[in-house]
Amino acid sequence: MNAPKTVTVKTALIVAGPTCSGKSALALDLARCFEGTVINADSMQVYRDLHILTARPHAADEAAVPHRLYGVLDAAVPGSVAWWRSEALREMDVAWAEERMPILCGGTGMYLRALTDGLVEVPDPGDAARSEARGLAEEIGPEALHARLMQVDPETASGLRPNDTQRISRAWEVWTGTGHGLAWWRSQPGLPPASCRFVSVQLDPEREGLRRAIDSRFGQMLEAGALEEVSALLERGLDPVLPAMRAHGVPELAAVLRGEVPLEEARKSAVLAIGRYTRRQATWFRHHALGKGDDGMISLRRYTHSAQESESQYEKIENFISERVDAAARAS
């Protein structure tokens, strides 16, 4: 790897892609190369209660280069796009002040797009609306609540999967608490994009290799104490609708701890659910560019630290970024 490269132009890197594609490893290597600060852009890795199941970077990696917005929220606090955007912008400013490159790393596309394209702010619908939405989701189920939402806010409901409890509950609370649907709010003028240049790298590995990696990693999570992590979370008696309680692996392992299913069955269910989620992630990223013009590249391989193939892949990515950073410096 080449000597660290100091970046003085207001540029930020984005490392995006589906779960288990190697984003954290790539971001770490890029941070070493470009004197970067890695900023979490994963909606589940913000929770301090879920270090293992969300595959947060290891302590040694976090010590090697600055890592920000990892494990900063309690599981009882629901994160939001608006909250993350504000925190990410603050961390980006800190990185630039320290003459470091902000490297936004994660698979939550809506978080990243809130920086690259801006964000419409939705007013807080209030505790009463939230309680009503969660109560209905538990009482009648997500599909019935989705049907109700379709009657009052078809524009929003038509874009949601009928079994997506979290998003349906959110849409219902916004409609009841503000008098307008999410789709309406998103059509209004909002916050502008971040005032910097983004250079993005999207990892899009082939499906079969990704599936094997997901299965292997979930096994490693179990060995590392994922069951104990979920047990500690359940002991807190938190609302099951909270995002942290719905993180991949939490519902499945909770069922094991309640004696409802054997561990192997739960493992298979979790791996399948994660696989389906990565397909949705990959589809989303294919339809939403995170860099303008030629400031984005797609790598069709999973990234690891050690493989010779990844070393060649890394050199291509580093050269791609260096060319665009140098061009920005010349233009400034």
Curated annotation (Swiss-Prot):
Site positions per UniProt: Interaction with substrate tRNA: 108, 130
A Pfam family matched in the record: IPPT
Gene3D superfamilies from the UniProt entry: 1.10.20.140, P-loop containing nucleotide triphosphate hydrolases (3.40.50.300)
Catalytic function, reaction form: adenosine(37) in tRNA + dimethylallyl diphosphate = N(6)-dimethylallyladenosine(37) in tRNA + diphosphate
GO molecular-function terms, A-Z: ATP binding; tRNA dimethylallyltransferase activity
The keyword Transferase is annotated on this UniProt entry: yes
GO biological process terms, semicolon-separated: tRNA modification
Ligand binding (ATP): 17-24
Enzyme Commission no: 2.5.1.75
Region (Interaction with substrate tRNA): 42-45, 166-170
InterPro entries: Dimethylallyltransferase, IPT, P-loop_NTPase
Record carries keyword Magnesium: yes
Known cofactor(s): Mg(2+)
Top-level taxon of origin: Bacteria
Binding positions (substrate): 19-24
UniProt entry keywords in alphabetical sequence: ATP-binding, Magnesium, Nucleotide-binding, Transferase, tRNA processing
Assembly behavior: Monomer.
Similarity comment: family membership: Belongs to the IPP transferase family.
PANTHER family assigned to the protein according to its UniProt record, in alphabetical order: TRNA DIMETHYLALLYLTRANSFERASE
Function: Catalyzes the transfer of a dimethylallyl group onto the adenine at position 37 in tRNAs that read codons beginning with uridine, leading to the formation of N6-(dimethylallyl)adenosine (i(6)A).
Stated name of the protein: tRNA dimethylallyltransferase
